[in-house]
Structures are given as structure tokens and as C-alpha cells.
Curated annotation (Swiss-Prot):
GO terms for cellular component: cytosol. One of its GO terms (molecular function) is pantoate-beta-alanine ligase activity. The lineage of its organism: Bacteria, Pseudomonadati, Pseudomonadota, Alphaproteobacteria, Rhodobacterales. InterPro entries: Cyt_trans-like, Pantoate_ligase, Pantoate_ligase_C, Rossmann-like_a/b/a_fold. It is found in: Cytoplasm. It holds the Pfam family Pantoate_ligase. It comes from the Bacteria. This is Pantothenate synthetase. ATP binds at residues 32-39, 149-152, 178, 186-189. The gene is panC.
Length: 285
């Protein structure tokens, strides 16, 4: 059965108030729509962990620093609702823009430190937009748990820190990246790739796995990175914005995985910006 689509905050709060009175836990899955199996895995995790589940769909203009990217972002509300129907979610919150950013809205949530590198450095203002809208969605839904994919690892860390710092009583649950058979991380942006582009994009993950394996065997990232960038270039990737080894908890740059670490990348292929990351096994002392 299809879940109700709610566009007004008052309607959302009426629903969640009833659930809370009944002592039911609420999970939220924030999305920008164009749902794929990665999103649906978050919905399944939320259903398993909470009594009630709200999926939010809002293409947030404040997190796009490129107007053309915003204009191209797919809007597929009816298809999204159809994909959610088998999961039995309790509400789909598709807020009208003025429910998020009413006239006179003047507040921005900014998280320093974690946002100074990688996505934050490449997309100025992006994470301020993310933190602001996610803070609003956390507060509007009153959810107990929020589900985010590890594909957007830096974003997941950002919203976790934001909720902690602002004393928002919610637990951020990270869920594994869902991948295509080729290893390509599922993303709404993938639908903009041609068939040939999808094939070439599938070469990103094997390059990352090879680097991770050699790091775990003791090689230094400084020695491996040039070859990895060359391999990505040969696959058709251009403008590799970052290819970094970072500490998993602080995003501090590393040369060897002497602590829990992630390998993270952002690069362009056929006019589409792709990001990915994987865990790297920690070296033994």
C-alpha cells in the first residue's frame, strides 16, 4: 500500500505526534529522490530498526553550488513513491519549498573542521546547505534514528557531528554502500551516464580496491596515488578532484593506514561527478 505523501509540516507533525503518544520509535531516511537500491537498503534498515519510518524527498537548492547541476538533478516523485510502496513506509515527506525555507529564512548551519577538505573544499557552501536542511528535517520529523549511506562518508560524519553539537536527540545510523555488479557505487547521478560511461565508471572500484590491498600490505599512499590517478585517467575519468587516504574518524590525511582509514575519491566522467570511498584495513603495529 502506498504511503501518504505529506507536503506540509503541520501534517507531518500531526502524524508523528500520534506515533510518539503511542510510544513508537521513528526512523527517517533523508533523500533527494531519484531513488535506487542504495536508498531502498536504507529504508529496509529503518524498517528493521524502528516502529515507524518517514522517507523525505527534497531537492535542496542550498547544497548545489552549480546551478546547472541543480537543474539536471532528476525529479521522479511518482516513480519514487512506487518503489517505496512494497516497504510499507508510514509517510513520504515531500515538503513544499516554503516548509523548509520560508520567507525571511536567514539561518545557516555550518560545521567546521570536517568540512574543510575534499567535498567541502571542492564544493564551497555545499556542506552548509546539507547541514542546514538535515538539521531542519531532524527537527521537523522528530525522528529517533536517521539512516545514511556510507557512500557519502564525509556527509555522514558531518550530520553526526552536527546532531551531537546541537543536542538533537537522534542517532545517525551508517549503512554499507550498495553497488552495481561492476562495483560502481549506486547513485542517482548514474542515470546520466551512457551505457559506455557506465562500463567505464565500473573501473573506479577495482582501482580503489587494488590501492587498498597494497596499502594493507605496507605500501605508502604517496607511492601508490600517481599510478592510481593514471589508471583512472586511462579509464576516461577527468578532473580527479581528490584521491585521498584519510583517518576514518577525523578525516586527517594519512600516508599509511596506521589507524582505521578510508580511501575516498571524486572524479568526473562524461560530465557526471562521481564519488566513492572504501574502508582500508589497518596496518598491524
Amino acid at each position: 500500500m502506498s504511503a501518504p505523501i505529506l507536503r506540509k509540516l503541520a501534517d507531518l507533525r500531526a502524524a508523528t505526534a500520534g506515533w510518539k503518544r503511542a510510544g513508537e520509535s521513528i526512523g527517517v531516511v533523508p533523500t533527494m529522490g531519484a531513488l535506487h537500491d542504495g536508498h531502498l537498503s536504507l529504508v529496509a534498515a529503518a524498517k528493521a530498526g524502528c516502529d515507524r519510518v518517514v522517507v523525505t524527498i527534497f531537492v535542496n537548492p542550498k547544497q548545489f553550488n552549480n546551478p546547472e547541476d541543480l537543474a539536471k538533478y532528476p525529479r521522479t516523485e511518482l516513480a519514487d513513491a512506487s518503489k517505496l510502496a512494497p516497504y510499507g513506509v508510514d509517510a513520504i515527506y515531500v515538503p513544499d519549498p516554503d516548509q523548509i525555507y520560508p520567507e525571511g529564512f536567514a539561518t545557516t548551519v555550518s560545521v567546521s573542521g570536517l568540512t574543510d577538505v575534499m567535498e567541502g573544499a571542492c564544493r564551497p557552501g555545499h556542506f552548509d546547505g546539507v547541514a542546514t536542511v538535515v538539521a531542519k528535517l531532524f527537527l521537523q520529523t522528530g525522528a529517533d534514528q536517521a539512516y545514511f549511506g556510507e557512500k557519502d562518508y564525509q556527509q555522514m560524519m558531518l550530520v553526526t557531528r552536527m546532531a551531537q553539537d546541537l543536542d538533537i536527540p537522534i542517532t545517525v545510523v551508517g549503512c554499507p554502500t550498495v553497488r552495481e555488479a561492476s562495483g560502481l557505487a549506486m547513485s542517482s547521478r548514474n542515470m546520466r551516464l551512457s551505457a559506455e560511461g557506465l562500463e567505464r565508471a565500473g573501473r573506479l572500484h577495482p582501482v580503489m580496491r587494488q590501492v587498498a590491498e597494497r596499502l594493507a600490505a605496507g605500501a605508502s599512499f604517496g607511492d601508490l596515488a600517481p599510478g592510481a590517478r593514471e589508471a583512472l585517467g586511462a579509464a576516461g575519468f577527468v578532473d580527479i578532484e581528490y584521491f585521498d587516504l584519510r583517518a576514518a574518524d577525523s578525516l586527517r590525511a594519512l600516508d599509511r593506514p596506521t589507524e582505521p582509514a578510508r580511501l575516498l575519491v571524486a572524479a568526473w566522467l562524461d560530465g557526471v561527478r562521481l564519488i566513492d570511498n572504501i574502508a582500508v584495513s589497518q596496518l598491524n603495529d
